[in-house]
């Protein structure tokens, strides 16, 4: 007969008063309201207990720490009492999530609440959509304004004061080299102030807007600054007064001193000191930076889109948004350094509050005049210069730099404005994204600014050359980014080296702009600066080879001492116009003859850096050419020539471009520089091709120690007179392709070279994949140097290696024969590849995406071979990485990224025209950019897997690169990349968890290329997924195409514990989670239930079902956890399997088992009287206690029985399943509790079957491979169980026991019962398909 349910109306008052302490009402605030049907059973007179209870819905929060607003809506309804107190504790987090602007402004982990609120897909998707609207609208919405204003103002100051920031950074780096961190510390304190001074940042924007009327007065102050520089700049400033001065207005008004002359440079210095100081040292704040990166990366793509829209509108916000994404990307590129954002904010805020104070103390003398400030700067720089001899140059440089920097930057916005006002919106668009890149590192503005200054003097010609200046900036950006990436990856040595690099590079950058002005002022300084920049770049390019760098530095110092003599000496060495270029080959020849491969590597590294930076310059050039239709026509040829020049050497390109500008600006002085100009025109344009090839060769040489001697003599010989003649032959071909074909022709090379830049790994996804591959591939390269040499011959090498073979002849007959063979091989392949590329390029000239697609098309053609080779090599290295060599790999990767990546990565891009590994790598990066295609994903998954094994460092690099890919991609690609970036950057706490999902995506891509629309809706929310949430909106990450799991999945998915990082539940401790669940699966074998109902004489399976239905009601009444319910049912079954139970004791057994389970699971379990009461007092206290003893003795006190609920939570967390999917699986699993037929199923298998059916019902089949991996069960093994479960759901309406059904029909449980079960025929199709 059915068990009696408690009827409280019949209870006497005495019992009511006796048990008044037990009422499960929400005295503790756990549930304010109760269902009516339960109040009938447990009236107000029911016992009141003061203990804390977890609700049935508590586990929902276990899967995801926060509940959406639906919980609030249902607060007054029947089952809200089931919502645990944890959810209520998280409601403020939800509120925070709603006010995203507050969280984003604070840049604290509070941004994660916004992420936490992603349990409901609609709510979260709305927020990201709002963010995108606001960003694209061109107006800063109230939500984003607070978040954007900080970076915007950062960049606004940087726009007006970018040069100042650059100066400061130079300053800082000089100080940091000497260890004078005292100056740095002040900025840090200022930064701390700035963290709390978010409002200040907001005020800056308002100031800038309010005081546009006052801009003229301030511009006059700036004009006074510029008077010190040139009168032309003053005129230009007057032209710009309205818009450009708005940038000045903000800092000046905030300073509350119209003397922007003095205050701004000091602020710049201080803020840059902060930058430097923070970027160098404070990696300890990794967690916050990660979150910051998440927020940044989430907003980067929309921000990038904004500048495109804003470019059309030449308002002040154009530069601000453009600058902001730059800063964001800078931080993402720097990965661990991401907390730079706060420093940057502090640079604005503190830079505007406390920086005034510090500059005043620092500048007490020169308050009235900036010259004195500049002199102080020069003096400080003299103190801290790495080279004593450089001091002579630095003083005038610093003076001119700081004079120029402000003026130059002002001038540059002038042109931007002019472009905006004039019809040249297209050119403005490109400069703006390029500015973004430049703003990523304010240091780069030196080139822009001098270029712009010189542009202003001639007039309209500046428009044509403006992209050139941007190109230079981008190259330097790449340099700087390389520095930062190397600093992140490399240990203390790298930091020191990078400091040196940054010092030298900054000096070189300073000197280059100084060279601009010195060219205007004095003619002698320019050649020395060029040389110094060349040598410094050598110095910087060598990076980790500090020992080798020193001799180069000595050369630079000597070069700086003898301003004119040094270039003359170079010319003497080369005896040809190619003197600058040949200097490195001459040195190489010397070193090669000596066999000092290390010294040879230096020039190689120099050229590599040169090529990497210059090549990066080349990319913006190509982009601008494609977009700036008006200007490009005039500039395409010189740009292409300059691209080639840049690829040869940055110094060459800089000198050449400077000479061009000089020729345009000062024709009087042109005579002095005419020789370098001619050099450029003749040898550089021609030699560039060779220089690229020697670079590739040198890169090869560095990886291949023995071949250095061969290649380097070849390089030196290449630089000889034969190069010119051969190049002249090649020049017409190159010139033909320059307008259209060569842009794209170089664009692939640009792409290649981008990726070749080892330090620019942050800028290109390819380098990250490549560095890892290069580590894997270095071995085969070293093993097969000759084959590699033959491979990496890109088109450029094809052009150059024919002359190579010709050049090689004079060196050695053997080498000449060797190179001839190589040349023949390469020429055969090169012609085909060149034709293909040219055709592809000509077709896709207008689109930036075409530039990416071209290599992708080529790669697709050549991918099969490459894929196999990559897989083999990756497999080779996957083994050692998994074996604990991850540290070694990371170190090697860092080193290789600076050294071998510069070399081998350049190799690979060069080789990527041929069917080489780079093609697959580019394909992989493109796969990320374009959304992984089934073909590209197959190749891409392997680099992902490789990255996953090194886990943290490589994961960071990978994610940074993904975010940086957005920089290189157009707005369309950004729209595609945003979900990826959102997923990958914010999950840096869950580094490998996302990578796991990515691997799932990649490997499962072949069958289902497209994602369901519902999954796309949640994409943005996935980007905000909090690591603390037990389950996140996993439909959002359903951009993962589905297919076979793949053989390598087992290897790739090793770092499971990262999924559990920062998880509050002890079951999901990141260190122990994997071991815990593997142990639970082992324990399952000890608790396998057998059929016991046959030997039970007095009870049946129907009575058991009634008991379980009643236990579900008890669990809801006492608001206890689901774990308690599942464990109680397990205890009952195990007891019944051992002991024959009477019918009248069955309810006692159930209540006692629930008591034991509550003691085991609940923090505040109900007391015995509570259970006696719910049993309607039909049992006595001693009976329950004796039953408790009996159960424990029967089970031998081993009651830690694995339950299906734990496994459900685990699967949901591993798959990042949404709450709706998880709740559906819980409903299915809880339905099985009543059914005796499922008693024999293992808990883990039952959970896997329930979750699999839920995935099928939610149309999320592409997660099935992931479930297979994490559960350990094959879908084929689960299919019979899935069919049974689907039948159970289909027949549930006819079931008389409705408690579970009614429980999950509530909105708190997402109305899981309303989701229809699958049709049996459809299920059969699904199962057969799988």
From Swiss-Prot:
Residues 20-30 have a biased composition (Polar residues). Ubiquitinated. Ubiquitination leads to its degradation during anaphase entry, after degradation of CCNB1. A motif (D-box) lies at residues 54-62. GO terms for molecular function: cyclin-dependent protein serine/threonine kinase regulator activity. Residues 1-50, 1002-1059 are annotated as: Disordered. InterPro entries: Cyclin, Cyclin-like_dom, Cyclin-like_sf, Cyclin_C-dom, Cyclin_N, Cyclins_cyclin-box. SUPFAM superfamilies: Cyclin-like (SSF47954). It comes from the Eukaryota. Coiled coil: none annotated. Residues 1026-1048 have a biased composition (Low complexity). It is found in: Nucleus. GO terms for cellular component: cyclin-dependent protein kinase holoenzyme complex; cytoplasm; nucleus. The keyword Amino-acid biosynthesis does not apply. Keywords: Cell cycle, Cell division, Cyclin, Meiosis, Nucleus, Ubl conjugation. Gene3D superfamilies: Cyclin-like (1.10.472.10). Its main location: nucleus. GO terms for biological process: cell division; G1/S transition of mitotic cell cycle; meiotic cell cycle. The N-terminal destruction box (D-box) probably acts as a recognition signal for degradation via the ubiquitin-proteasome pathway. Cyclins are positive regulatory subunits of the cyclin-dependent kinases (CDKs), and thereby play an essential role in the control of the cell cycle, notably via their destruction during cell division. Its tissue specificity suggest that it may be required during early meiotic prophase I. Belongs to the cyclin family. Cyclin AB subfamily. Interacts with CDK2 kinase. This is G2/mitotic-specific cyclin-B3. It comes from Canis lupus familiaris (Dog). The gene is CCNB3.
